[in-house]
Amino acid sequence: EVYGLSGWVSHHNLDIWGHSGPVGYFGQDEDPCSYSMWPMSSGWLCRHLWEHYCYTEDLDFLKDRAYPVIEGAVKFYLGFLFPYGEYYVTGPSTSPENRFCGEDGKSHSVGMASTMDISILKELFGYYLKICNTLGIEGEKADVKRVLSKLPPFKTGSFGQIREWFLDYPETEIHHRHVSHLYGLYPGNLITEKNPELLEACRVALERRGDEGTGWCMAWKACLWARLRDGEHALGLLKNQLRYTR
């Protein structure tokens, strides 16, 4: 109803009443769009359904429970994406809670095709095609294949880091606790040792962010360092997370 599109979508906030639309302190926060305008949690949540099947190989679960939910999310994103040059992009788009310095020299949070958005969609569309093939269902395969082939590639920024946004904008908060642009490394599986250049770009991005953050952010960073085969760094973050506080 909010977007006038088919399928379903959820944002950063879910509650016991099933409300999943954008929620923010509009008129109070300086920039509520930086956290509320994020229609990508449905894509992330679908990943857990796919992982459940990968571990259990439960075809009944895949067909009866996972597929209908995942297909609904896919339908929404097929309608949400739009052509921009040679690519299909998301918009409005954010890298949750972080901001960038625009060409006008001002701080902004809303752009298009953030790296996190595209990473989530590449994974979602990828395993949707696998599900269709496994179940022998045509579904939205043709449109998904067409759009997937035109999603923007990962790009590196001026510091050798994975870009956070579609264009090489400088972030206004280098040490922001979120590492949304590294979703493709973890929890995703888009960036692996088969892509050494992208792995190094992830390392640079993670080093620029630093180790500080809230509890869940430290846990995410520990997982990212583990994916980068740096167990000592991951262990250091876990020890820091489990220390006594006063």
What are these language model-derived features?
Residues 7-19, 81, 112, 162-166:
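Generic preference for hydrophobic/aromatic residues in regular secondary structure cores
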Residues 1-2, 8-9, 27, 33-59, ...:
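Active-site core of glycosidic bond-cleaving carbohydrate-active enzymes
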Residues 48-51, 70, 75-80, 186:
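Structured mid-domain segments that build the active-site/substrate or prosthetic-cofactor binding neighborhood
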Residues 14-37, 93-113, 244-246:
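Acidic/His metal-coordination segments adjacent to aromatic residues that form catalytic metal sites
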Residues 72-131:
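Acidic/histidine-rich catalytic neighborhood
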